Amino acid sequence: MIWHVQNENFILDSTRIFMKAFHLLLFHGSFIFPECILIFGLILLLMIDSTSDQKDRPWFYFISSTSLVISITALLFRWREEPIISFSGNFQTNNFNEIFQFLILLCSTLCIPLSVEYIECTEMAITEFLLFVLTATLGGMFLCGANDLITIFVAPECFSLCSYLLSGYTKRDVRSNEATMKYLLMGGASSSILVHGFSWLYGSSGGEIELQEIVNGLINTQMYNSPGISIALIFITVGIGFKLSPAPFHQWTPDVYEGSPTPVVAFLSVTSKVAASASATRIFDIPFYFSSNEWHLLLEILAILSMILGNLIAITQTSMKRMLAYSSIGQIGYVIIGIIVGDSNDGYASMITYMLFYISMNLGTFACIVLFGLRTGTDNIRDYAGLYTKDPFLALSSALCLLSLGGLPPLAGFFGKLYLFWCGWQAGLYFLVSIGLLTSVVSIYYYLKIIKLLMTGRNQEITPYVRNYRRSPLRSNNSIELSMTVCVIASTIPGISMNPILAIAQDXLF
């Protein structure tokens, strides 16, 4: 009898929860329409996978790519609408959030064709791979629009769980298993630290969880300059630091980059930084409004350490993926300059512009690494020697993307860094910008060292891997080369479209 009553109560509670969720989705679903498209794509993938055979594999790529493209289209149609707070204050829709969501969707759209040949050659499970990519994209999009502490915690956890599974996707690879274990342990520790910081912020504000209400709560409780806020700032900075991976929170990055499947690394290297940057700007700028001097100082230290350590250690690397891991640590140091400057001197606009260019430069480089790795089976930098003699297109594409990452004119990286450093200089960050300029010169050195190897034509320097280099007969080869071509073009000819890009970035503020 007791069991029967408990069962009825459980059914009633479940029904109420379902009706509440249905009510929220019915009245607020239009505010997350791009996200709903991805959810529909996920459900469709699961349905087709459970009712089809291996011959329908092309449909999986088509559904995933189409859902991402439609989601981008829906996002563009919503551009310039009035800011809206929905789901009882949990989610905010505005231009600033939407442009970061657009960048995440763009990353995922380019990463799927980049993964096709790799999946076919390694015989990875395709459906689960695409499901994890789409779910991680969904988590990143929700993080960009998160407006309360609970959503800011849950959304990155959705992204992180998929990231752990993707990094260990090749279960038979010992390096992949090692990378996954390090990533999981450090990710779990960082999440715990982040939640602890949120608890201090929650208590100091009098029990508020919405970002703007936290500010009002701190004013009402007179706790905005209390030690509790300083403790919250330190813990939250450490927690976000592991997501952004600046020095000294970068320990997991090289191992995960080296051990994970290359398309997964390409995906994580850009989407995680875009989503974490969007979240960091809102957390630091709104709840810690009264502690701006303190978090500016903390971020300046992180930026300096990242730019110096990332670029110096990258010089000594022998693996392309580890080199790009340390390079990404240096790159996030440049992005932090934009976060520090804020919207007073177009800091956010410069950060958004640079991240757009960074996506094309980084994904273009990883596309080249995927192709070379599949055709030779190596990742060693020295094994790239003489690639120009066998595949001029791949060698030139790699060279252009690397030069753009280094910031040489007239490539995209130059304009992105120029705008970013100029905004930092105008904001009075002279020392930070000087460090950025010096470390950019250092990065050009190790990029040029690789390009010299690519272009060498002397037989004694050409490695056996390049001598036996053969193009892949797979049709899917076209998809990865298409993705690579798009990234290379976006990395090389930004001067024509710089003014519209800057105008859009300047509009995408709070």
Curated annotation (Swiss-Prot):
Membrane topology annotation: Multi-pass membrane protein
Reaction catalysed by this enzyme: a plastoquinone + NADH + (n+1) H(+)(in) = a plastoquinol + NAD(+) + n H(+)(out); a plastoquinone + NADPH + (n+1) H(+)(in) = a plastoquinol + NADP(+) + n H(+)(out)
Protein name, UniProt field: NAD(P)H-quinone oxidoreductase subunit 2, chloroplastic
Subunit description: NDH is composed of at least 16 different subunits, 5 of which are encoded in the nucleus.
Record keyword NADP present: yes
EC number: 7.1.1.-
Species name: Ananas comosus
Compartmental location: Plastid, Chloroplast thylakoid membrane
Family under the similarity heading: Belongs to the complex I subunit 2 family.
